[in-house]
Amino acid sequence: SYALGDGDAPLRAVRVTAESRGLLAEILSPWGAGTLRVPLLGRFNLYNALAVLGSLCMSGVTLGDALAALENAPAVPGRMQRIDVAGAPLVIVDYAHSPDALEQTLRALREHASGRLWCVFGCGGDRDRAKRPLMGRIAWEHADEVLLTSDNPRSEDPQAIIDDIATGIPAAGARRECDRAAAI
């Protein structure tokens, strides 16, 4: 088993630090101790890294080699995926498509943010309309700036979807740009 922090699990990550480039943690394990650096964002990814670390070590890979391998772990495309552009702010793409997923994503990113946290998002068309205002409220509560845009409207009017989302945000509280490319 594995865990974050103190406890009885044989594999533990302690002194966890969220940095703009990823996560840093001290590892305590039956195979020794070491420093884990993963270029992944969000503490949930630390649980994934611990699972991989334990599997590798139980398969005979040394702790040092396993830690080195995880330093280059790629993000799953569309899931807390970094878009690095020299001289530009840190941009993350995530497929958060439910209120809970959006909230967890923004909470995770807040730990890594060193400046203002922007949320550029939209809701898909022909899907649960009731969640749109809720997602707007969550974005408003957890981001410093919110920009509403189109996201696969299907048969719906993109502006109507944005208007639905905006009902969960205080008046004039979010920017709007229907053209997704322009919004990004």
What does each of the following model-derived ranges do?
Residues 6, 84, 178-179:
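Short loop/edge segments at beta-strand edges and connector loops
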Residues 6, 124, 150-153:
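Short, ordered loop/turn segments at secondary-structure junctions
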Residues 20-21, 30-145, 167, 172-174:
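Nucleotide phosphate-binding/pyrophosphate-handling subdomain across enzymes
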Residues 23-25:
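Short aromatic-glycine-enriched beta-strand elements
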Residues 148-163:
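Redox- and metal-dependent alpha/beta enzyme cores, enriched for Fe-S-associated oxidoreductases
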Residues 175-179, 183:
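Short acidic-hydrophobic, aromatic-tinged amphipathic segments that line or gate anion-handling sites
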